[in-house]
Design a protein with these regions (language model features):
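Pre-Walker A adenine-sensing motif
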Residues: 1-13
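Conserved lysine of the Walker
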Residues: 29
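Short regulatory helix/loop adjacent to the ATP-binding pocket of P-loop NTPases
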Residues: 32, 36, 138-155
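Conserved NTP-binding/hydrolysis module of P-loop NTPases
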Residues: 39-43, 49, 53-72, 86-87
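Conserved P-loop NTPase "ATPase switch" module shared by AAA+ and STAND
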Residues: 85-115, 136
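Conserved small helical "lid"/interfacial subdomain of P-loop NTPases
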Residues: 156-184
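Accessory nucleic acid-recognition modules appended to NTPase machines
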Residues: 198, 202-337
Length: 337
C-alpha cells in the first residue's frame, strides 16, 4: 500500500493523480495516508456530517494556512474550495486528502458531481496528488465503481486496506509480551481480527493475555461494546435491525438460509445477497465434495471482530445494560473459542 502511495506522490509532481483508499473502520487508513505524505506539503480534511457551509468554514483557514492561498470572502460551497485547490495545483505540487469521502452523499450529493466536473476541467494541467478514503464500503463502491456515477473511471490508483495477518499479529504480541501463549495469540486474533486500532487499544491497556484481553473488551465503558453498532448502522440505514439479526444468527451457528428464514420468519435471500455482494461482510461456504449446483450453502462472517461482536456482545446487550458485565465476561471466557 505504501509503495502505491509513494508512486502516486512521485507521479503527481508532473501529472495529476487520483487515488481512492477503502477499508473498514479502525483499519489504519488515516494513519497510513498521513505517514505517506509527512515530508511533503499536504492538505488534510475530514468530512464530518454537518452542513456544507460549516464544513467550508472549517476547511477555509486550513487551506489558507497550509498552502498560503489568500481566500477572500466567505465560501459556502465545497465546489468553490475544490476549484481553488485545483487551480493552485497548476502552479504547485501538493497532496489533498479527503477523509470519509462518502459523507458528502449525506451532506449534499451534488458535491460528487461538482468534483467530477472540476477534476475533468483542470486535471490535465494539474500537479495534484488527490487522495480520498472512506470506510462505508457500499457507498464508496457505488461512488467509484458504478458506471452511472460521476466519478466512475476517474481514478488512477485504488487501494483496499486489509487487517494484519496472523504473522504480523504474532510479531506485535511478541514485542509486548515475549512469553505469550498460543491461547493469548488466538484470543488476540479472535477479538481484533487483525484490525490495527483494536490491537493498539489492547496493547496500550497492557492486556497481553487471554483473561486481560477479554476483561478489557467487555468491561463497562470499553469501546469494543458499541463498535459493531457504530460501524454498521450507517451502512445499513433504516434496515439495520434485519441485518443485525441475520448477522447475529450466522455468528451463533445458524448458517443456512433455511435456518435463518425459519427464525426470522421471512425470506432473507435479498438480505444475504446484499451482505455478500454489496457489503462484503459474509461469504458462501459449501461443504467439501458438494456438487457445483448443490443447495447446501452455508454463510460465514468474514470479519473476525464482527463475528465476536455479533456472537457475544449484540445478543447480550440486556446484560450489559443492567451493568452485569462480569456475567458476560465469565460466559465468554468459557465459550469464546
Amino acid at each position: 500500500e505504501m509503495a502505491i502511495l509513494y508512486a502516486a506522490k512521485k507521479q503527481s509532481q508532473t501529472s495529476a493523480c487520483f487515488t481512492v483508499m477503502t477499508g473498514r473502520r479502525r483499519i489504519g487508513k488515516t494513519a497510513l495516508l498521513l505517514e505517506s505524505v509527512k515530508d511533503t506539503r499536504f492538505v488534510y480534511i475530514f468530512v464530518a456530517r454537518k452542513s456544507e457551509v460549516l464544513l467550508c468554514a472549517q476547511y477555509q483557514p486550513v487551506i489558507q494556512e497550509t498552502l498560503g492561498i489568500r481566500i477572500y470572502g466567505e465560501i459556502r460551497e465545497f465546489a468553490q474550495l475544490f476549484e481553488l485547490l485545483m487551480q493552485h495545483s497548476q502552479k504547485e505540487n501538493f497532496t489533498l486528502i479527503i477523509d470519509e469521502f462518502q459523507e458528502f452523499l449525506y451532506i449534499n450529493p451534488s458535491i460528487v458531481s461538482d468534483i467530477q466536473r472540476i477534476w475533468d476541467q483542470y486535471h490535465a494541467t494539474s500537479k495534484i496528488n488527490f487522495i480520498v478514503c472512506g470506510s462505508v464500503y457500499s457507498m464508496m463502491k457505488r461512488i467509484f465503481e458504478d458506471r452511472k456515477e460521476p466519478l466512475y473511471g476517474r481514478l488512477t490508483a485504488r487501494i483496499s486496506l486489509h487487517p494484519f495477518t496472523t504473522t504480523v499479529i504474532k510479531e506485535i504480541l511478541a514485542d509486548h509480551a515475549p512469553q505469550f501463549t498460543s491461547e493469548d495469540l488466538l484470543c488476540l486474533y479472535l477479538l481484533t481480527g487483525g484490525v490495527a486500532k483494536y490491537i493498539t487499544l489492547l496493547m496500550e491497556a497492557k492486556a497481553f493475555n487471554k483473561t486481560a484481553m477479554i476483561d478489557y473488551a467487555l468491561s463497562e465503558g470499553s469501546p469494543f461494546l458499541t463498535e459493531g453498532k457504530d460501524m454498521l448502522i450507517s451502512e445499513f440505514g433504516k434496515d439495520y435491525a434485519n441485518y443485525f439479526s441475520i448477522l447475529s444468527l450466522i455468528a451463533e451457528g445458524k448458517t443456512t438460509q433455511r435456518e435463518i428464514d425459519s427464525i426470522i420468519n421471512k425470506n432473507t435471500g435479498s438480505y444475504l445477497a446484499n451482505l455478500e455482494d454489496e457489503y462484503s461482510l459474509i461469504k458462501k461456504v459449501k461443504p467439501m465434495f458438494a456438487k457445483p449446483n448443490s443447495r447446501a450453502t452455508r454463510y460465514c462472517l468474514q470479519d473476525n471482530f464482527l463475528r465476536f461482536w455479533f456472537r457475544f456482545i449484540f445478543p447480550n446487550n440486556a446484560v450489559l445494560e443492567m451493568g452485569k458485565n462480569h456475567l458476560l465476561i465469565e460466559y465468554v471466557e468459557k465459550n469464546y473459542e
